[in-house]
Amino acid sequence: MDRTAKILLRFRLFRGPARYLANSRVAWSIVSRIDRVRGVRAKSRLLSSDRSRLPSHISIIMDGNRRFAWSNSMNTVHGHTAGKEKLKQVMRWVLDLDVPYLTVYALSSENISNRPEDEIDVLYDLYIEGLNEIALDPLIHENRVRVNVVGRLDLLPAKVREAIEVAEMATQSYKRFTFTICLAYGGREEIIDAVKSLAKEHAEGGLELDSIDVNAISSRLYTSSLPDPDLVIRTSGEERISNFLLWQIAYSEFYFTDVHWPSFTRQDLYWAIEDYVSRGRRYGS
């Protein structure tokens, strides 16, 4: 579906129908069975390929909940709720491929100040619900998934921070997979906080200026325990970074899809990974 939509989007006359094709619930209900068959085939191709070429760390900018709702004549609350349920599905698909790291961009620090207060309150309630579900989810415990929430968490209400603590404590001993949620997160703010940490340590005499290098900064980021992302996926047709993992994505590969996040399918994930596998990573060379 997404490939067909991408072709149609090249022509102005077909842009409206193409967007509908990529995101309509009606359209997806028609092709869902075909997509499941294609998904099985794509998964088989991926698992039979050289596993060392698969990404170890996938990061996703989950964009398009509101546009999904608007395009389907729904309230934005339903769009965010659908986005939450989609994340649970994607987690299963990623675990199914044995990808050890998944990081998602759930809420930016800019969203907190720029979105309507009632919408942010809905998001907070969904985060609390989702984090509490994670703490009890058999899938999380069977696969030994460690939950990690990063960002300027002091910006969040106490009730959200409490739910974060519950999910992290329930999974803190797990090491097989790591699921990182970026909440109240901003890439620039993360770098600023790392630099402040370096400056403080230097002022106290514990750090020489000559010892400040890439590793010194990386070790002070919110994501210091994670490898850099191999593949960054952004949904909903926007082709920008939006202040996400600015330091960590220096050599990541990017995949953009026109599909809104709630419409993202298993096949879309496999296409993104197949596209990644087909590339030759250069790491700046």
Name each model feature, range by range.
Residues 1-285:
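Flexible, compositionally biased loop and terminal segments
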